[in-house]
């Protein structure tokens, strides 16, 4: 069985590494320098970094220069997310040399553009599906974005290479991942799925790893690592 890829997260707000609860602005806990956090995960054995510009996602400015600095300082693979919704923001993201880019809100609001980007960039593009129930939520999670499975069907037809699935109700809560949601998304696509939100323990990671045969490829881990629920080394060992 192939192992679950782990993607420690560095979310950047106003120049700081932060974690949110339910992805809501105003719930930040700051963890200092994004570059230091990213380098610490790399030193601990991470093969991936999930790097998010929260200001860009929420439309409260951006941390573009800092995000580029962090991405370019990494020797490991970087998945870049947050506010990538037009040609300009996509070009800036790709220019960092990141391995792949997560489209979020843009996928909901400008479907024609997303189809074009998927056709042009293929495997460098993943689409973030931020879900509450079976409804997608766009732009920093404050808007309704339509039905999950209708959108998934459309993106499958357009050739989307990968999905990053977040259960907003679980994100930043340390309440455990939504395994049913992950199973349902995997059943609706033959593309790999990256799980995000709710991981609180090594058992949660083992449970997600149990879905690798169903199509789950990776798990983004944020608050549990920052809250020291377990170390990245322990997580890598538990899922190898």
From Swiss-Prot:
<dbReference type="InterPro" id="IPR023016">
    <property type="entry name" value="Isoase_HisA-like_bact"/>
</dbReference>
<comment type="pathway">
    <text>Amino-acid biosynthesis; L-histidine biosynthesis; L-histidine from 5-phospho-alpha-D-ribose 1-diphosphate: step 4/9.</text>
</comment>
<dbReference type="InterPro" id="IPR010188">
    <property type="entry name" value="HisA/PriA_Actinobacteria"/>
</dbReference>
<comment type="function">
    <text>Catalyzes the isomerization of the aminoaldose moiety of ProFAR to the aminoketose of PRFAR in the biosynthesis pathway for histidine and the isomerization of the aminoaldose PRA to the aminoketose CdRP in the biosynthsis pathway for tryptophan.</text>
</comment>
<dbReference type="GO" id="GO:0003949">
    <property type="term" value="F:1-(5-phosphoribosyl)-5-[(5-phosphoribosylamino)methylideneamino]imidazole-4-carboxamide isomerase activity"/>
</dbReference>
<keyword id="KW-0413">Isomerase</keyword>
<keyword id="KW-0057">Aromatic amino acid biosynthesis</keyword>
<dbReference type="InterPro" id="IPR013785">
    <property type="entry name" value="Aldolase_TIM"/>
</dbReference>
<comment type="similarity">
    <text>Belongs to the HisA/HisF family.</text>
</comment>
<dbReference type="InterPro" id="IPR044524">
    <property type="entry name" value="Isoase_HisA-like"/>
</dbReference>
<feature type="active site" description="Proton acceptor">
    <location>
        <position position="11"/>
    </location>
</feature>
<keyword id="KW-0963">Cytoplasm</keyword>
<dbReference type="InterPro" id="IPR006062">
    <property type="entry name" value="His_biosynth"/>
</dbReference>
<dbReference type="GO" id="GO:0000162">
    <property type="term" value="P:L-tryptophan biosynthetic process"/>
</dbReference>
<keyword id="KW-0368">Histidine biosynthesis</keyword>
<dbReference type="GO" id="GO:0000105">
    <property type="term" value="P:L-histidine biosynthetic process"/>
</dbReference>
<comment type="pathway">
    <text>Amino-acid biosynthesis; L-tryptophan biosynthesis; L-tryptophan from chorismate: step 3/5.</text>
</comment>
<keyword id="KW-0822">Tryptophan biosynthesis</keyword>
<keyword id="KW-0028">Amino-acid biosynthesis</keyword>
<dbReference type="GO" id="GO:0005737">
    <property type="term" value="C:cytoplasm"/>
</dbReference>
<dbReference type="InterPro" id="IPR011060">
    <property type="entry name" value="RibuloseP-bd_barrel"/>
</dbReference>
<dbReference type="GO" id="GO:0004640">
    <property type="term" value="F:phosphoribosylanthranilate isomerase activity"/>
</dbReference>
<dbReference type="Pfam" id="PF00977">
    <property type="entry name" value="His_biosynth"/>
</dbReference>
<protein>
    <recommendedName>
        <fullName>Phosphoribosyl isomerase A</fullName>
        <ecNumber>5.3.1.16</ecNumber>
        <ecNumber>5.3.1.24</ecNumber>
    </recommendedName>
</protein>
<feature type="active site" description="Proton donor">
    <location>
        <position position="130"/>
    </location>
</feature>
<comment type="subunit">
    <text>Monomer.</text>
</comment>
């Amino acid at each position: 069985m192939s192992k679950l890829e782990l993607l420690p997260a560095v979310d950047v707000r106003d120049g700081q590494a932060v974690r949110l609860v339910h992805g809501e602005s105003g719930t930040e806990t700051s963890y200092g320098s994004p570059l230091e956090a990213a380098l610490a995960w790399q030193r601990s054995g991470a093969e991936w970094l999930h790097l998010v510009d929260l200001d860009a996602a929420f439309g409260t400015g951006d941390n573009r220069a800092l995000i580029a600095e962090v991405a370019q300082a990494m020797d490991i693979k970087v998945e870049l997310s947050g506010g990538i919704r037009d040609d300009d923001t996509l070009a800036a993201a790709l220019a960092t040399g990141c391995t792949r880019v997560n489209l979020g809100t843009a996928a909901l609001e400008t479907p024609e553009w997303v189809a074009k980007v998927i056709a042009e960039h293929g495997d460098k593009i993943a689409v973030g599906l931020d879900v509450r129930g079976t409804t997608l939520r766009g732009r920093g999670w404050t808007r309704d974005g339509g039905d999950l499975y209708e959108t998934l069907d459309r993106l499958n037809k357009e050739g989307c290479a990968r999905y990053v699935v977040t259960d907003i109700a679980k994100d930043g809560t340390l309440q455990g991942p939504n395994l049913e949601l992950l199973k349902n998304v995997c059943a609706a696509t033959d593309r790999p799925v990256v799980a995000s939100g709710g991981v609180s323990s090594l058992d949660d990671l083992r449970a997600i790893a149990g879905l690798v045969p169903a199509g789950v490829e990776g798990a983004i881990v944020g608050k549990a690592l920052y809250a020291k629920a377990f170390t990245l080394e322990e997580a890598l060992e538990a899922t190898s």
